[in-house]
A protein has these predicted regions:
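Gly/Pro-rich, tryptophan- and cysteine-flecked surface segments typical
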Residues: 2-10, 19-130
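Surface-exposed, well-ordered secondary-structure segments
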Residues: 15-16
Length: 130
């Protein structure tokens, strides 16, 4: 790919929920579980990817969010998300002049903090592929 094209043509996003219950992931009858593996995100050709993480329980949750590049499986962004009971966290992966950017207006607790302007490659930006 040319340097000016966005990476993230094919990538995997995994959101792993850390809980004190069982260390095994499963899907129950209500279609909820302990892990989400989302197979692709894209910000190419005017497309955006929107992801919503919902805590359907009455418990507090610690969630690990990892974005992995499709071309060589390198991690391009990760952060911890701390959710209160029945909390909802939404973010978008959208085009940026230098690649792709994760943006959210949500005020949920993330570490590192995601600024309202979004976060990108060199200090948490989703990088381009050379």
């Amino acid at each position: 790919m040319k340097k000016n094209l966005l990476s993230a043509a094919v990538a995997a996003t995994s959101v792993v929920v850390a809980s004190s219950a069982v260390g095994q992931a499963y899907i129950n009858d209500r279609l909820t579980g302990e892990a989400l593996v989302y197979p692709i995100y894209s910000a190419q050709n005017g497309n955006d990817t929107y992801i919503h993480v919902v805590n359907t329980t009455g418990d507090y949750k610690a969630v690990k969010v990892r974005m992995i590049e499709g071309e060589n499986s390198q991690e391009v962004l990760d952060f911890n998300l701390y959710m209160s009971p029945k909390d909802h966290f939404a973010f978008a992966i959208t085009a940026d002049g230098e690649g792709a950017k994760l943006k959210t207006t949500d005020n949920s607790c993330t570490v590192p903090i995601i600024p309202s302007a979004g976060t990108t490659a060199d200090g948490k930006t989703i990088r381009e592929v050379s």
